[in-house]
Regions:
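Enzymes and membrane/adaptor proteins characterized by extended Gly/Ser/Thr/Asp/Glu-rich
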Residues: 49-52, 56-178
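Preference for extracellular/luminal or secreted protein segments
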Residues: 1-62
Length: 178
């Protein structure tokens, strides 16, 4: 793809974007009018650590990040932070969280289903669906639009502290089912 043509080569009307003509034009016009510095800022998704307006404005107006990830806090605080972030940003942000065990990955009040391995131990894939559905509904209610879940890693090395109980197990079929 020639330099400068990458945005026109992407099918924004198809999967995963499904934009109408107005949405596609907004993306193309926005991209065309962004400086190189602004485009670089869009690739960053730092960890948010507080809701102070000065910090939120720094992320959205100075750095012009593409997204932010927050750890669990009260639902009221998360919703307030997400609303401010979107209001301060010229481009809609990706707002991320680890909701791998349920909505409590974003808000203390969220539903906890336990770690994925515990859910898989029920041998009922419907529980995996319930966990994901609930996490998505609860996250979306607060403004979340990017969930780092479900975990589809396979636990081939039970000594690995990164995957371990955060997976649905060591059987690829079971992981797929859940």
């Amino acid at each position: 793809i020639e330099r400068g043509k990458i945005m026109t080569e992407i099918d924004m009307k198809g999967n995963p974007f499904f934009l109408d003509e107005e949405g596609e034009n907004w993306v193309l016009d926005t991209w065309k009018n962004m400086s190189l510095e602004q485009k670089c800022g869009q690739v960053f998704c730092p960890m948010g650590f507080n809701g102070e307006e000065e910090t939120l404005k720094h992320f959205t107006q100075d750095i012009q990040v593409g997204g932010l990830m927050y750890r669990a806090d009260s639902a009221e605080n998360i919703q307030d932070i997400y609303r401010k972030l979107q209001a301060f940003s010229n481009i809609p942000l990706l707002l991320a969280a680890n909701t791998e065990a349920g909505g409590d990955g974003l808000a203390y009040e969220g539903t906890s289903f336990g770690k994925p391995m515990a859910v898989a131990a029920t041998d009922d894939p419907e529980n995996g669906y319930r966990m994901g559905y609930t996490a998505c509904k609860e996250g979306a209610a607060l403004g979340l639009n990017w969930s780092f879940a479900p975990i589809v890693d396979i636990n081939y090395d039970f000594h690995n502290p990164i995957t371990n109980v955060r997976t649905f197990g060591s059987d690829p079929k079971k992981v797929l089912d859940f």
